[in-house]
Amino acid sequence: MVSFPVLAAGGITDINPGLTLWTGITFLVLLFVLGKFAWGPIVKMLAERERTIREAIDSAKRERTEAERLLAEQKALLGKAAREAAELARRNQQEVEAMRQELTARARKEADDLVATARKQIEEEKTKAMSELRAVVADLAIDAASRLVKANLDDASQRKLVEDYIAQLPANRAA
């Protein structure tokens, strides 16, 4: 048969008052030593770690808030820059249109001035030509009248006389 020495000596369930007393005293001494020398630094280290973690969380929250603020600020600046660029493009377009209209008006005025000058010159030349023509016609009429007065001719003779005189004119000679 198998025998168990622990059970033979009284077993596990037997309470030994001396051993229990010394185990309790040892536990209390160990608890006092740990409380005196180890418990304070451990609690201090845990409190420091908790403070460090809390500061890191607070710092992360502040940095996130700052990043969100900067992002909103950047978006606002981009929007402002886009609006300014659109306004600048609009103003440039207006300036280009104004310059185009000014150049068109100036060109139109210059063309109108040239046309007016040309018309004036044409009118002057026409007036001059008409004056010269009147003078020539007057000279012709006077000359024809003087010839008619000198020679009293019939209609056919008068017509022949005028045609001969016209043929003698300088313009017809050059032709």
From Swiss-Prot:
CDD domains: ATP-synt_Fo_b. Its main location: membrane. The chain crosses the membrane at residues 23-43. Keywords: ATP synthesis, Cell inner membrane, Cell membrane, CF(0), Hydrogen ion transport, Ion transport, Membrane, Transmembrane, Transmembrane helix, Transport. Pfam families: ATP-synt_B (PF00430). It is found in: Cell inner membrane. GO terms for cellular component: plasma membrane; proton-transporting ATP synthase complex. It is a single-pass membrane protein. One of its GO terms (molecular function) is proton-transporting ATPase activity, rotational mechanism. The keyword Acyltransferase does not apply. PANTHER family: ATP SYNTHASE SUBUNIT B, ATP SYNTHASE SUBUNIT B', CHLOROPLASTIC. F-type ATPases have 2 components, F(1) - the catalytic core - and F(0) - the membrane proton channel. F(1) has five subunits: alpha(3), beta(3), gamma(1), delta(1), epsilon(1). F(0) has three main subunits: a(1), b(2) and c(10-14). The alpha and beta chains form an alternating ring which encloses part of the gamma chain. F(1) is attached to F(0) by a central stalk formed by the gamma and epsilon chains, while a peripheral stalk is formed by the delta and b chains. F(1)F(0) ATP synthase produces ATP from ADP in the presence of a proton or sodium gradient. F-type ATPases consist of two structural domains, F(1) containing the extramembraneous catalytic core and F(0) containing the membrane proton channel, linked together by a central stalk and a peripheral stalk. During catalysis, ATP synthesis in the catalytic domain of F(1) is coupled via a rotary mechanism of the central stalk subunits to proton translocation. Belongs to the ATPase B chain family. This is ATP synthase subunit b.
